[in-house]
Amino acid sequence: MKDSIQIKGARVNNLKNISLEIPRRKLIVITGLSGSGKSSLAFDTLYAEGQRRYVESLSAYARQFLGRMNKPECDYIKGIPPAIAIEQKVTTRNPRSTVGTSTEIYEYLRLLFARVGKTISPVSGTEVKRHTTEDVVQCATGHADGTKFLVLCPIRIPEGRSLEQQLDIYHQSGFARLEYKGEVCRIDEFDSRQADTEQMYLVIDRLAVSHEKDAISRLTDSAETAFYEGGGEMMLRFMPDGELHSFSIRFEADGITFEEPSDNMFSFNSPAGACPECEGFGKIIGIDEHLVIPNSALSVYDNAVVCWRGEKMSEWKEWFIRFNSERGFPIFKPYYELTQEEKDWLWHGVPSGMAPRKLRSEKLGGKEVPVPAEWTICPEEREWGLLSIDAFFEMLRQGQYKIQNRVMLARYRGKTTCPKCHGTRLKPEANYVKVGGRSITELVDMPVGVLKEWMDALTLTPAELGVAQRILTEIRQRLQFLQDVGLEYLTLNRPSASLSGGESQRINLATSLGSSLVGSLYILDEPSIGLHSRDTDKLIKVLKQLRDLGNTVIVVEHDEEIMRAADWLIDIGPEAGRLGGEIMYNGPAQPLPQDCQAGTSHTLDYLTGREVIPVPESRRPWNAFIEIKGARANNLKGIDVRFPLNVMTCVTGVSGSGKSTLVRDILYCALKRQLDEAADRPGEHVSLEGDLQMVKAVEFVDQNPIGKSSRSNPVTYVKAWDEIRRLFAAQPLAKQMGYTAGCFSFNTEGGRCEECKGEGTVTVEMQFMADLVLPCESCHGKRFKQDILEVTFGGKNVYDVLNMTINQAIEFFTAHRQPRIVGLLRPLQDVGLGYIKLGQSSSTLSGGENQRVKLAYYLGMEKHAPTVFIFDEPTTGLHFHDIRRLLDAFNALIQRGHTLVIIEHNMDVIKCADHVIDLGPEGGARGGQLLCCGKPEEVALCQDSYTARFLKEKLDMQ
């Protein structure tokens, strides 16, 4: 190939000296079993070299600030462009980072509001403008020719001067008249002793409307004089009906001076825009709404406010109901149905959004408080302030000398929405600025799909369009990219730290599209994670868009649709670990060769139908269950869901439909608390019911690393290494030398090499180049002192055992009759990890391998207490062949009396479940409903479910 990336002799990790050519400007999928060497080729070879070469081209000064990549171990790589890796990691934990800021959409929104936003007075609803003489001329010429009018300005009296003295100065300056109570009179004839300056204006000029050049020039001069004399204010009074028009060169209206819009005014990361109460975080430490009202399905009358229960505290509930029901508060309405104004009424004592003119000031609880004019104040309110939850806790604060009050305050304290900005993070002034009748905080609260529709429908004046056209184009494009990658359910104010790995990766993908880079190498790690089959087509379209810009797009992927849509397919195998690392296929994705020998490539076998994951012949029956009632956290719509026990349940639905909220935030946390274990506060729900006595433990199994340190390895995780160390300590030479089991640990002093602290390698820091990792000169990479290595068992020392694979170790310890060690290692073999070495660092394991190590740990546990295992997308990083093994491990857990609840999009797993719970129909606000539940065959018949359509194909129910 002429235009290609050429790799010769790649030997990174388990790659077997491979050489291959990869075409440029194509969509390439690298696939293979978990642990076969896909990431070693894509990230540790291609990305490392592409990034290293780019960084090497920079100055030594710039290089010291950038992450330095190791030079991959290979003979040469030719034709590689600068590389960008988009991984499945949540890249930020910064609480200030949101979807809007990370995609740069929020920066463009700030610019839009700063340039074309209109400030609207909250008092009268009129637009706040800084007037010019052109506005004055425009107002005057809008009347009929010949209409007489006065040019007026307010009379300003400097400190230390009387009205009479000021009028005398005006007269000496050439002004002859003033207007008082609508009447024009001469200054020299005016009696100023009883005059009210509020109703008095200086007459600058008397004119008639005319479009002639001289008349307009005179009006402009008079307007400038009026602005000067009036301190920035002036008026036009039209005759004969006395119509008055006010103008101000100050940015004010209704007696309030407003801040002029600027882009920093809308930034919660700038002191100019951040809410002063929460400093732009949107949350403060205060009274937690969810602790005060844990069940939002209840009304105030039905004891929704838990701190108002009990003999003494229930007085507050009675007072609130007695007085506020008369004022119009809906005491029988469930809390979740209350409007924001009604919630503010309950919390703060007065409905929000009331016009100031409808309020009067009253001294309540020792403070001046604005209250609605028509309200009658009761004695309790005079003592404590307006009856509300806030007033109740203020009463407790005042009595903090009582221990019961301090306990009560501590019980309800937590992170809560900032009462000043209501979680918007911005100063209240930012909400006065509108574009198309909406504030910036309203826009970032909309789901991306709804915001895109609103932006498309937005109409601006030609002058505004001239300023904002480019900004609008950027916003619309970026919103479209987010929709294209299946994230239309997210809002722009969603914190980045709350996103899943898949969502975070697809946001980075959308941001990359927005940057329109060309001629680069993009390497993506399973972008389909967390994506429903419905949205895979959209993702493929985005990947092809990225390719069509002139980029080379390499995707490490297991999704069948993405494999078939690729231009080029690279399969690495045949197995995993030391049995992998070879190129099994490197060629066009379509058409696939039909004549390759069965068993040489698992990928081609599955894609051509020679291998399949079979549908179970029958589903397990169940009677016992756990039920969550009234689940209402995030977007869930008060649903009741049953989770059967001792079977495999899959929770399905499109991205953002509420699966993680239901399973992780409610079921897992509620079960942990039910078992009296420490857990985060469960998401909002009414109750957890069912056969709870049958559940003795709950475990959440994710793909996070089992240990981030290079010392951690799978054999220590499953507790097999402890037994192996005891075995070596029991050998005659070890006993003779007084060695304990601790001497055979590379983590503690005694037997390990102290030069490298048991690592086997020494890291040499290089200032401008990648750090060098060299074998330890003292132990030659063997991690232990020489005298420890002299202790052998079956002819092998401790280093030899660490170098064995799981399969070799099982064979070795079986031959030497060590059933306990074999029993601890066997589960690792059962979950398909027989290829990894006993001493292999956990940091080198893939996400799928990490999860299977955890599975092996649970399979090897001796206790058989019925446990609920919760898995969040366990097929991430797993090939079709790995999924078969995973399902075998799942079945082994169920046979031991355990329960499995799995959040999953993979149809091969869903079709093998005993029970499916499908949420939807869409993501975000349009999701959160229970569409259907039952056996896969029953769910496949559901008309409203996207899952059903794809499940029907997998079950051959056409």
Model-derived features with residue positions:
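Conserved phosphate-binding elements of NTP-dependent enzyme cores
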Residues: 1-958
